Amino acid sequence: MKRAWVLGATGATGTALVEQLLGNDEYSEVHVFVRRPLQLQHAKLHVHVVDMERAEDWQTGPAADVAFSCLGTTLRAAGSKAAQYRVDVDYQLQFAEMARRSGVGTFVLLSAAGANAKSSLFYMRLKGEAEEGVRALGFERTLFFRPGILDRGVKARVNERISMAILRVLNRIGLFKRQAPIAVEALARQMIRGEARLRDAGEYVLAERAILDL
């Protein structure tokens, strides 16, 4: 039986991930780190309310085998590039550092297609920097998931709905098949499946088609 940590449990992908972990017989404990208490209750669920800005909240955590980080925001929601960087990079890395100090062997990071720390595009660059920060911590096993457009269902943002509509039309005529939208529920399922199937120590980088092929 495995024990999991989750950061970003209230986002679209994180919510789906937590629900699936709770229903997975391979997991005995699911620890979520959130800013506010959750309404969800389950025998396996352990909720840790933390202050992202309090270093003492991020020293060590309960014993676990794998940590999943699904945290992320948008520039619009954050209000500035500095604030978005704080969420997408700094908060995720302090979570990863706590996991490493606590003896967690596997770290699974939800990144994005095109993540590159040297990119001229801010969003791609911060995703790449988050990956590099996690990589430098030297987990026994690291999985980077780089999906393209996420289908959040009713939670989808306007620009995401437009992008998905265009991409689906292109997919139907045989174009950009590797960049088809992926539902957050399917992504969460593949993150759990990837952690279970890719057992050898090392680093795994999974882009759109590789995610679906797990």
For each predicted feature, which ranges?
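Conserved Rossmann-fold NAD(P)-dependent oxidoreductase catalytic core, especially the SDR/UDP-sugar
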Residues: 81, 86-131, 136, 140-145
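NAD(P)H-binding glycine-rich loop region in Rossmannoid oxidoreductase-like domains
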Residues: 4, 39, 46-94, 98-101
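Short, conserved active-site loop motifs that form the nucleotide-linked donor/cofactor pocket
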Residues: 44-46, 142
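Oxidoreductase cofactor-interface core, primarily capturing Rossmann-like NAD(P)-dependent enzymes
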Residues: 26-28, 117-214
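SDR active-site strand-loop-helix element
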Residues: 7, 33, 70-71, 107-113, ...
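Short, polar loop motifs at secondary-structure junctions
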Residues: 31-39
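N-terminal Rossmann NAD(P)H-binding glycine-rich loop of SDR-like oxidoreductase domains
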Residues: 2-24
